[in-house]
């Protein structure tokens, strides 16, 4: 099991994997938690759905480790598809593949991980050694620190690299990647909505990245052209004032599926806790579907419980997680 993902506490009702130790012989139970004390887990149906099977009780002395899982079974190809669509939405100023075709290296503003990291998108990336010499040379040329984007499972080789040199890396918080299909959507509501091909100064003035204003160059990269469609959405007060914003992208995954991704969600101070985040999300989902998107994804820091609840209300479920690892300066 991964050492860098899913260390959060589990709760009743959640889907988990529990490893049992029978005198050195290990066995995993995957299912839904019925009780924590005693630990009772009902094995899952195919696909990760709840079942009616008999529950399994795991005594404390047998429990080796327990980890929370995403609500449904996820294939590695599902994870890769979303990360490919995301990479197309955040290409950076320059991007190129390593010579083995397994890692996409991106350099941009030096601020956001999505545009300034190397990510394992090739089908064999999880099984081959990380091509660190190429990655280090790429970021040295751009005068940026080495940063690896590590999606769980398909980033297994990067996890091994970090485990071998834990003191050489700084790990950022876990990020949830949440998804939903666009077949049936919530009603957008009657708040005035507008979407533009490019943001104006009012949109840019409202946007912050993790609570901080972005430098001018980073804002320029945010609106740079991508291999897909981009839209800058906003909600308007009756006076015409911009009161909430978001950036939407339509990009393809490797299998040709069109994905709506939306990010840069911000609600103006004084307008928060009025349901505008939900209304903005509903409008963006409707816009994405009208533009031909079949599914939607977004990313939220795992510790942002309010954000996670908001997106669950919009029909999103956690699919997988990823983290960024930054190489620390080497001491001579």
Regions found by a protein language model. Give the residues of each.
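Short amphipathic alpha-helix that is part of the acyltransferase structural core
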Residues: 1-8, 12, 62-83, 119, ...
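Conserved RNA-binding domains used in RNP assembly and mRNA/RNA metabolism
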Residues: 1-100, 104-111
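Acyl-donor-binding surface of acyltransferase catalytic domains
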Residues: 83-92, 128-215, 325-326
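A short, internal acetyl-CoA/4′-phosphopantetheine-binding micro-motif in the GNAT/acyltransferase core
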Residues: 119-126, 265-272, 301
